[in-house]
């Protein structure tokens, strides 16, 4: 795992079309959410795919223009998904037992690209 600034530098060096920031949330909440910067279509696809796999609260899409990672990545599509709360026991267990669903939600989003 790279530190945040290094991750941004490496992603930009690769000149990629997609940069997907995979996160889990903390702070005593519950549910999934996804941040976007400028282009929300792919972020929406990732979040909707993941949300179809769980019954936790769906916190929706959020403007990520204040987030360092999203502001500084040059890729056009750069969702930052918070896959649930790792400090919530039930959600943490779901993440640990269903990490394949996290990956599948991203794969499904790529398959929907026209």
Cite the ranges covered by each PLM segment:
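Catalytic-core regions of hydrolytic enzymes
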Residues: 1-41
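Extracytoplasmic/secreted proteins, especially bacterial periplasmic and envelope-associated proteins
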Residues: 6, 15, 41-49, 101, ...
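Active-site-adjacent mobile loop/cap segments within catalytic or ligand-binding domains
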Residues: 14, 18-21, 25, 62-114
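A generic "cationic amphipathic patch" detector
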Residues: 24, 32-33, 47, 59, ...
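Active-site-adjacent substrate-binding region
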Residues: 38-63
């Amino acid at each position: 795992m790279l530190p945040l600034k290094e991750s941004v530098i490496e992603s930009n060096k690769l000149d990629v079309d997609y940069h997907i920031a995979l996160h889990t949330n903390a702070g005593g909440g519950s549910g999934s959410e996804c941040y976007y910067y400028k282009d929300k279509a792919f972020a929406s696809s990732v979040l909707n795919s993941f949300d179809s796999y769980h019954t936790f609260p769906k916190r929706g899409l959020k403007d990520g223009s204040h987030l360092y990672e999203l502001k500084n990545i040059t890729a056009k599509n750069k969702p930052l998904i918070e896959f649930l709360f790792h400090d919530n026991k039930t959600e943490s267990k779901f993440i640990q037992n269903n990490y394949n669903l996290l990956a599948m939600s991203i794969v499904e989003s790529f398959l929907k690209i026209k």
